[in-house]
């Protein structure tokens, strides 16, 4: 029986392998005239009739991403404090509740007084009742009018 295809003699051998770098050549399928002509002609998006027009604003969308809730006027707070038409700060709840929005009357107060007033404004804002709104992904819009229109067109 043999020990394998060939028996190697004992000792060290050095083998030098030189690799020739391979060259990859790319060839254009079009001449230069056609390339510049294609760049000038941009492809335009064509919307299918099934794509939703976002509230008739010519903003086409294929899915829902958010729901707009318009601001509602405050009910009791505005009646108690009164509407102010001129341009100075009365500390209405509609003003920002961030720490950077300090009114002129807060300038003379100490840090603790300003903090207490800011926390009170924040508490009032959080206590305001807001009707719960469904998540956009939980409630789908009613497309029955759109479907009815398509059925009439098909007949």
Swiss-Prot record:
Q: Which Pfam families match?
A: PPI_Ypi1
The signal peptide annotation in the UniProt record is: none
Instruction: Locate the compositionally biased regions of type Acidic residues.
Output: 75-84
Q: Which family does it belong to?
A: Belongs to the YPI1 family.
Q: Which PANTHER family match?
A: E3 UBIQUITIN-PROTEIN LIGASE PPP1R11, E3 UBIQUITIN-PROTEIN LIGASE PPP1R11-RELATED
Q: Where is the composition biased (Basic residues)?
A: 116-127
Role description: Regulator of type 1 phosphatases which maintains protein phosphatase activity under strict control.
Tell me where on the tree of life, at the top rank, the source sits.
Eukaryota
Species name: Kluyveromyces lactis (strain ATCC 8585 / CBS 2359 / DSM 70799 / NBRC 1267 / NRRL Y-1140 / WM37)
What name has this protein been given in UniProt?
Type 1 phosphatases regulator YPI1
Q: What is its main location?
A: nucleus
Which subcellular locations apply to this protein?
Nucleus
**What Gene Ontology molecular function terms does this protein carry?**
protein phosphatase 1 binding; protein serine/threonine phosphatase inhibitor activity
User: Which keywords does the record carry?
Assistant: Nucleus
Q: Record's Gene Ontology CC terms? A: nucleus
- State where composition is biased (Basic and acidic residues): 145-155
For the region Disordered, what residue ranges are annotated? 1-47, 72-155
